[in-house]
């Protein structure tokens, strides 16, 4: 909802949006969300103000990304299920004791943490939907072991894809290990249970934010729209602007075949990354 004070500013904000060197489809979507959300209106107004002040196109790129990669880009079905069953997944999140490395003959090949750090696909084969002993017993169990395992595989397949394609990640950063690693105290025993519970909560929150917000897959509809803008816009500057804004695009290849998110998704870099302008 838009507050009454901000509602008075919407016409002026709409005029500012229409004056930006953005494609008309982007302008339409921005205006729609500004009319219906005070928070989004403020974000758009801030980016417009910074662009007008500095004449820096990175603020236009930010508007394109907010529009086509977040606000008008729905979560794929498996991420909606991640959101729906977040607390239950926290109770079953994969983990590894750091002390277990001491008993391994070759931790580099046996440790789940090392397999993830080294980007080894073997890490995906060891996922199990098993309730750990730090679980919150007040959470109602709704997923069967098969459903939970499938959902974990969907989540971790997206994570593995991003880890294997660091250039597509937000800020081109290396992403952390997605499992919980339970550390040791200096004396060699495990840390307190309350701290371990917080590790599970933080880890699932970090993975959710990384997959759903910082690096959300682009819908095939939006990939097609952005592809048309990049190839058919009248000015080269607009084509280049949209291609820069889409430099981290990737999609779920079996998106339309699984509306309920019951299959493990497959991913590929966006075709718009390869388009010549």
From Swiss-Prot:
GO terms for biological process: mitochondrial genome maintenance. GO terms for cellular component: mitochondrion. Its main location: mitochondrion. Keywords: Mitochondrion. It comes from the Eukaryota. InterPro entries: Gep5. It is found in: Mitochondrion. Pfam families: GEP5. Essential for respiratory growth and required for maintenance of mtDNA. Required for cell survival in the absence of prohibitins. Belongs to the GEP5 family. This is Genetic interactor of prohibitin 5, mitochondrial. The gene is GEP5.
């Amino acid at each position: 909802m838009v507050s009454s004070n901000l509602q008075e500013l919407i016409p002026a904000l709409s005029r500012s949006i229409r004056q930006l060197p953005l494609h008309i489809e982007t302008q339409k979507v921005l205006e729609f969300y500004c009319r219906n959300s005070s928070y989004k209106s403020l974000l758009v107004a801030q980016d417009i103000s910074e662009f007008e002040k500095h004449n820096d196109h990175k603020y236009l790129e930010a508007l394109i990304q907010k529009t086509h990669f977040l606000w008008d880009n729905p979560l794929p079905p498996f991420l909606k299920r991640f959101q729906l069953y977040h607390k239950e997944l926290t109770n079953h999140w994969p983990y590894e004791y750091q002390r277990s490395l001491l008993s391994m003959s070759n931790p580099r090949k046996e440790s789940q943490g090392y397999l993830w750090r080294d980007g080894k696909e073997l890490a995906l084969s060891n996922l199990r939907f098993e309730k750990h002993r730090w679980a919150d017993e007040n959470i109602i169990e709704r997923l069967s072991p098969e459903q939970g395992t499938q959902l974990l595989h969907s989540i971790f397949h997206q994570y593995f894809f991003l880890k294997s394609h660091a250039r597509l990640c937000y800020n081109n950063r290396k992403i952390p290990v997605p499992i919980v690693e339970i550390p040791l105290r200096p004396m060699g025993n495990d840390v307190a249970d309350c701290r371990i519970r917080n590790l599970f909560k933080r880890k699932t929150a970090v993975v959710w934010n990384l997959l759903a917000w910082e690096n959300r897959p682009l819908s095939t509809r939006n990939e097609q729209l952005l592809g048309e803008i990049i190839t058919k816009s009248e000015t080269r500057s607009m084509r280049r602007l949209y291609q820069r804004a889409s430099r981290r695009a990737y999609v779920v290849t079996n998106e339309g075949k699984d509306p309920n998110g019951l299959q493990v998704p497959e991913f590929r870099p966006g075709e718009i990354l390869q388009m010549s302008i």
